[in-house]
């Protein structure tokens, strides 16, 4: 009998050792379709006395896509005297094949937590990413059109150290530091050039890291009301020659990554929200400021707003989002007709607490000058399971 009890205790030890580890994640995928429309207006010239307007559109492209599936592990250990060790490891996965090849490519860290707050090091989400959970709850493989990808281009999970304060009567704050060697490198994208009537391929050239990057945040929550302020500063921005390509095309565009880095890049975002019963409202405003690397230190700026509203009717949650970017200022001059507008509408239907059908449609119009624009129409239907 004693031998059986001993064996039972020994077999339970490994389970006790990992009892504080949680496995979680989301598997979500579906069918997406989208098409592009554009208009180009050419002013009169000697060879062309009339205004020339060219319109074009692509066919509808449909494919099965992963909508951002991931898996995560997290846990903690009591170190005594109110101190805990905390850790987390998250990884992108794809049910449509492909996906990330390195572990910990999502928020992954190790740290300490106690009455003083929480200190973490690793790939840690910044304050902008935290705030976007309320303003952009959409699931899609197309983050530029079917999510508020332009508005939330500063969301990131940089390799950094972050401190979060404890709650003081509803207020809390955070500071975050990204060392220069961990900041994203600017680079010249691969491209073709014409030499002696021959197309010559020029490979991508990776440059030096941009600079140290600093983040700060302030949060407030009282009942159904919540608000946050997010701040970013980089002495040398690493987005490349033209930050406004990020504004227009999104951070993954090669056109956004040239060789003329910006200086004194700072971003400010205010987000407010209200939740009551089945109603959820969120509103955000964002200001992006920078200087050019030229001797004149000319100024750039973009101003944007976004709003999201949803209401639960039984198992269904209809939702709508709107974002607007005002005409930008580049090198001290206002860009005429350089705004953008975006609308996303859809509904989630919960089959259970963990499994939902997700349906959405999106429209994005980017004005790229007087008489010029690019428009993206997108729609998706899929399934999401949380565990």
UniProtKB/Swiss-Prot annotation:
Q: How does it assemble?
A: Homotrimer.
Q: Which InterPro entries match?
A: Gram-neg_bact_OMP, Gram_neg_porin_domain, Porin_dom_sf, Porin_Gram-ve, Porin_Gram-ve_CS, Porin_Neis
Q: Which domain of life is it from?
A: Bacteria
Which family does this protein fall into? Belongs to the Gram-negative porin family.
* One Pfam match: Porin_1
Q: Which GO terms describe its cellular component?
A: cell outer membrane; pore complex
Q: Could you tell me what this protein is called?
A: Major outer membrane protein P.IA
Q: Which organism is it from?
A: Neisseria meningitidis serogroup C
Q: Which GO terms describe its molecular function?
A: porin activity
Segments passing through the bilayer: none
């Amino acid at each position: 009998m004693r031998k059986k009890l001993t064996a039972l205790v020994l077999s339970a030890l490994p389970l006790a050792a990992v009892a504080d580890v949680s496995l979680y994640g989301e598997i979500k995928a579906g069918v997406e379709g989208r098409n592009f429309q554009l208009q180009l207006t050419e002013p009169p010239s000697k060879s062309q006395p009339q205004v020339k307007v060219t319109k074009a559109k692509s066919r509808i492209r449909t494919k099965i896509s992963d909508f951002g599936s991931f898996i995560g592990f997290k846990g903690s250990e009591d170190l005594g005297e109110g101190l805990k060790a905390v850790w987390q490891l998250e990884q992108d996965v794809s049910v449509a094949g492909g996906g990330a090849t390195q572990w910990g490519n999502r928020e992954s860290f190790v740290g300490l937590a106690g009455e003083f707050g929480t200190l973490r090091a690793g790939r840690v989400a910044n304050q902008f990413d935290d705030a976007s959970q309320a303003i952009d709850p959409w699931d899609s493989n197309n983050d530029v059109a079917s999510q508020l990808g332009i508005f939330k281009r500063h969301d990131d999970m940089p390799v950094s150290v972050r401190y979060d304060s404890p709650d003081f009567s509803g207020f809390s704050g955070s500071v975050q530091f990204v060392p220069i060697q961990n900041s994203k490198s600017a680079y010249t994208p691969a491209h073709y050039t014409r030499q002696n009537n021959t197309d010559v391929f020029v490979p991508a050239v990776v440059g030096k890291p941009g600079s140290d990057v600093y983040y700060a945040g302030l949060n407030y929550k009282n009942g159904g009301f919540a608000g946050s302020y997010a701040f970013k500063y980089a002495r040398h921005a690493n987005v490349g020659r033209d930050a406004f390509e990020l504004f227009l095309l999104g951070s993954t565009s090669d056109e956004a990554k040239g060789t003329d880095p910006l200086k004194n890049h700072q971003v400010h975002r205010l987000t407010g929200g209200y939740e009551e019963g089945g109603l959820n409202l969120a509103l955000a405003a964002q200001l992006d400021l920078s200087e050019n690397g030229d001797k004149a230190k000319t100024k750039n700026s973009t101003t944007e707003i976004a709003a999201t509203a949803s209401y639960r009717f039984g198992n269904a949650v209809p939702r709508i989002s709107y974002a607007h970017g005002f005409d930008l200022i580049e090198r001290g001059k206002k860009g005429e007709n350089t705004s953008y507008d975006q609308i996303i509408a859809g509904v989630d239907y919960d089959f259970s607490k963990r499994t939902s059908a997700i349906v959405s449609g999106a429209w994005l119009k980017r004005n790229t000058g007087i008489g010029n624009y690019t428009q993206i129409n997108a729609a998706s239907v899929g399934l999401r399971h949380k565990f």
